[in-house]
């Protein structure tokens, strides 16, 4: 095995072990992701197999690459899973706003923390575009039939966003969602030559072509204004 692989493998095992230690501990009420980063697809299976009954009574919050884990948890029937700010957001300018929002949801299930369209009878879910595209067709893919699916992106060129949205809207299960909403796509690198369409134009195009309803814009993204989107419903079941 190459030497460079050992530290990564060790970190991977440590991350899974640390997650399970907290998730299965009765004395904790929530698991709040510190950051996204890469590698969650490598630990998700071990984590999901190792979760015990106390883990089902917790709230889980994160976004970006953590969406792999959130998807797996939701597929496994966990009821308090949400896309929203992470601890690392404190490092952004004005990041304390995002952190307060996360804590208000985790501690009090405060309704003002939610993305404004969340609520009512419609189920919801939210993902980073690249993450959702890459988990489709895997054991982590949850059943999103009838859900409003909100999507956001960061640091991906428009041609990649286009390709990912093609893949998402072509999926048989995604064709049964209630519709797609587009959050913010931040820090898009320039295309050379220019792609010629904005992120909203691209999303509208693939919704129209696939027959998936376009439901407008969502207040989520890789930024301090990232609102909370619970998977399935508008409130934490233990609130």
Which residue stretches match the model-derived regions?
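Charged helix-capping and loop-helix junction motifs
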Residues: 11-17, 163-168, 194-202
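ATP/nucleoside-binding phosphotransfer catalytic cores, i.e., glycine-rich phosphate-binding loops
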Residues: 184-239
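Conserved anion/nucleotide-ligand pocket segment
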Residues: 78-137
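Short, acidic/small-residue loops that bind anionic groups at enzyme active sites
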Residues: 48-72, 80-86, 213-215
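Glycine-rich, charge-decorated loop segments at or immediately adjacent to ligand/cofactor-binding or catalytic sites
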Residues: 67-78, 223-230
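Internal helical hairpin/lid segments
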Residues: 140-192
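N-terminal glycine-rich "phosphate-gripper" loop used for MgATP/nucleotide binding
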Residues: 32-41, 63
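ATP/NTP phosphate-donor binding region
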Residues: 1-27
């Amino acid at each position: 095995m190459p030497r460079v692989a050992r530290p990564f493998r060790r970190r991977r095992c440590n991350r899974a072990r640390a997650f399970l230690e907290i998730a299965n501990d009765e004395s904790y009420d929530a698991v709040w992701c510190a950051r996204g980063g890469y590698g969650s697809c490598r630990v998700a299976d071990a984590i999901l197999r190792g979760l015990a009954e106390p883990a089902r009574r917790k709230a889980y919050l994160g976004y970006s690459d953590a969406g792999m884990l959130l998807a797996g948890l939701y597929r496994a029937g966990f009821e308090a899973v949400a896309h929203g700010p992470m601890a690392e957001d404190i490092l952004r300018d004005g990041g304390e706003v995002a952190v307060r929002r996360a804590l208000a949801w985790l501690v009090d299930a405060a309704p003002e923390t939610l993305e404004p369209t969340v609520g009512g009878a419609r189920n919801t879910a939210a993902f980073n575009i690249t993450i959702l595209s890459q988990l489709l067709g895997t054991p982590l893919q949850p059943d999103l039939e009838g859900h409003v699916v909100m999507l956001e992106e960061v640091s991906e060129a428009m041609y990649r966003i286009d390709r990912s949205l093609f893949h998402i809207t072509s999926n048989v299960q995604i064709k049964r969602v209630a519709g797609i909403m587009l959050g913010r796509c931040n820090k898009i690198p320039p295309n050379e030559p220019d792609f010629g369409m904005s992120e909203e134009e691209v999303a509208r195009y693939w919704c129209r072509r696939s027959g998936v309803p376009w439901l407008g814009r969502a207040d989520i993204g890789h930024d301090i204004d990232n609102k909370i989107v619970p998977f399935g419903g508008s409130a934490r079941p233990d609130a």
